[in-house]
Structure formats: structure tokens, C-alpha cells
Swiss-Prot record:
Belongs to the small Tim family. GO terms for molecular function: identical protein binding; zinc ion binding. The modification Phosphoserine is found at residues 57, 87, 94, 96. This is Mitochondrial import inner membrane translocase subunit Tim8 A. It is a peripheral membrane protein. One of its GO terms (cellular component) is mitochondrial inner membrane. InterPro entries: Tim10-like, Tim10-like_dom_sf. It comes from the Eukaryota. Mitochondrial intermembrane chaperone that participates in the import and insertion of some multi-pass transmembrane proteins into the mitochondrial inner membrane. Also required for the transfer of beta-barrel precursors from the TOM complex to the sorting and assembly machinery (SAM complex) of the outer membrane. Acts as a chaperone-like protein that protects the hydrophobic precursors from aggregation and guide them through the mitochondrial intermembrane space. Its main location: mitochondrion. The keyword Ribonucleoprotein does not apply.
């Protein structure tokens, strides 16, 4: 039994590059869908007083502004995380100090 678990571990290490790419793409899609869901929920709660047969101009402007601010904020956070990640020393380098 131990040999099968070690062989499955080595099989995971040698995953087909196409499969890895597929998994990465699907993970990105899932993250995007989660982001859209969060944005929709947040903006709906903020902008929609009472659902009606037609979206009034105030609600439409609120939705547009909400979505733009959500995207701006998300982009700002991603950029800040990227800067922070680049400025941190590599873990192995910090151990050698």
C-alpha cells in the first residue's frame, strides 16, 4: 500500500503540462465568477431600494459607480500585493541571514 501512495505522489509531481494549464484556467474562471458574484451582491444591496419593472436613472448611475469603484479597489489591492510580494526577500534568502 505504501508503494501506491508514493507512486501517486510522484505522478502528481509529473502532471501533464496541458492538464496544469487547464486547471489554472479553470481556477481563474472560478475566481472571476466569485468576484462577479461579490460585486453583484454588494452593488445590489447598495443601489437597489426596491425592485421594479424598470431600472431608474439613479439606480443605474449607482450601479455603474459601484462596479467601477469595485474594479478600481480590486485592481489597487492586486497591485499593492504584487508590490509587496516583489519587495519581500525570498524565503530561503531570509533564512540564511
Amino acid at each position: 500500500m505504501e508503494s501506491s501512495s508514493s507512486s501517486s505522489g510522484s505522478a502528481l509531481a509529473a502532471v501533464d503540462p496541458q492538464l496544469q494549464h487547464f486547471i489554472e484556467v479553470e481556477t481563474q474562471k472560478q475566481r472571476f465568477q466569485q468576484l462577479v458574484h461579490q460585486m453583484t451582491e454588494l452593488c445590489w444591496e447598495k443601489c437597489m431600494d426596491k425592485p421594479g419593472p424598470k431600472l431608474d436613472s439613479r439606480a443605474e448611475a449607482c450601479f455603474v459607480n459601484c462596479v467601477e469603484r469595485f474594479i478600481d479597489t480590486s485592481q489597487f489591492i492586486l497591485n499593492r500585493l504584487e508590490q509587496t510580494q516583489k519587495s519581500k526577500p525570498v524565503f530561503s534568502e531570509s533564512l540564511s541571514d
